Amino acid sequence: MSTSFARKSHTFLPKIFFRKMSSSGAKDKPELQFPFLQDEDTVATLHECKTLFILRGLPGSGKSTLARLIVEKYHNGTKMVSADAYKIIPGSRADFSEEYKRLDEDLAGYCRRDIRVLVLDDTNHERERLDQLFEMADQYQYQVVLVEPKTAWRLDCAQLKEKNQWQLSLDDLKKLKPGLEKDFLPLYFGWFLTKKSSETLRKAGQVFLEELGNHKAFKKELRHFISGDEPKEKLDLVSYFGKRPPGVLHCTTKFCDYGKATGAEEYAQQDVVRRSYGKAFKLSISALFVTPKTAGAQVVLNEQELQLWPSDLDKPSSSESLPPGSRAHVTLGCAADVQPVQTGLDLLEILQQVKGGSQGEEVGELPRGKLYSLGKGRWMLSLAKKMEVKAIFTGYYGKGKPVPVHGSRKGGAMQICTII
């Protein structure tokens, strides 16, 4: 063996050995038990999404270790933005306004490049700062996953005083702690479809709207969709449901209103919610439906998914109850001045009618399945073959208000859309 080959072998083998040791060790450490690190289905699914991992925690709590592990796990197509690299000392942002400006410019630059996995490593203890990041995620259509260390000392200021690299005092750490003690709750939790699954379902919904709009049975019922006496022979349903989600589609589980909604904190603290946060699921779509107010897709939840479904969401206006998960849906569009929450209510009314014995009238067969008219302008396409869509369970943390949605690689602003 030549000495040059021996030297190369000697430097190469320890790297492989270290990589195996680090990955196997991670599986055994409770502080590293995150689906996006340990579950290979989740890792594969996240490669199909645009995700902003926002690290939160006190200095020395283990954020940077987690950030490096995420980058190592997803390697290609991953970028980390660390406050440390900008010499930002944890504390008041006002003291580092120029540094944060540069950090945000770099982060936005990666967003414009459609980097699949972005990791932001900072304390992120201030609500105002997080709101800025959530708005950026909305603008570039990134889903957000908040990541907090699970280390035993993460909130122990006495230990953190010895561990943090900035040599912050006990008082400095105690000032940062209040913003990190409570769970940060989203506007709502839900399953967020991958980009490919969103496009597939969105296209299926659009084709259904076009087919329904051209169907002779639908044309006879236009009065439910058109106000006034002016006769009309056809309606463009794609334009009618012009209020559509701009980015990835989603199926809401629990509306939290950032912790203000009834039962929000109890839901977020459930062990199954904590374990499932940031994890991949496969949702089953059984039907597409249209009412004068909304267009949506019915989701059939399996036993695992039902564990994440709140028990109080399937109660229609009448007293007769429906099975758990009945309200599960994906909003595909809303008519003007209609809020997205109406989609689930419309689905409950349809299912309540079916349960009461009124199946509706089968009026024909479309390429994807049988079309039913349920009266009052309500239509359902029962899919002959269920659609399977991939999704990540996480939260939506933005304001749910119109934001300028930016193009990616072309760089221009596209339009102003409402997140629904």
From Swiss-Prot:
Substrate binds at residues 252, 331. Changing residue 417 to S: Abolishes binding to myelin. The active site is at residues 250, 329. Keywords: Hydrolase, Lipoprotein, Membrane, Methylation, Phosphoprotein, Prenylation, RNA-binding. It is an enzyme of class 3 (hydrolase). It is found in: Membrane; Melanosome. Gene3D superfamilies: 2',3'-cyclic nucleotide 3'-phosphodiesterase superfamily, P-loop containing nucleotide triphosphate hydrolases. The keyword Membrane applies. It is a lipid-anchor. One of its GO terms (cellular component) is mitochondrial outer membrane. One of its GO terms (biological process) is regulation of mitochondrial membrane permeability. Residues 418-420 form a propeptide. The modification Phosphothreonine is found at residue 262. The modification Phosphotyrosine is found at residue 110. It catalyses: a nucleoside 2',3'-cyclic phosphate + H2O = a nucleoside 2'-phosphate + H(+). The modification Cysteine methyl ester is found at residue 417. GO terms for molecular function: 2',3'-cyclic-nucleotide 3'-phosphodiesterase activity; cyclic nucleotide binding; RNA binding. Changing residue 331 to A: Reduces activity 700-fold. Transmembrane segments: none annotated. Its EC number is 3.1.4.37. Exists as monomers and homodimers. PANTHER family: 2',3'-CYCLIC-NUCLEOTIDE 3'-PHOSPHODIESTERASE. Belongs to the 2H phosphoesterase superfamily. CNPase family. This is 2',3'-cyclic-nucleotide 3'-phosphodiesterase. It comes from Rattus norvegicus. The gene is Cnp.
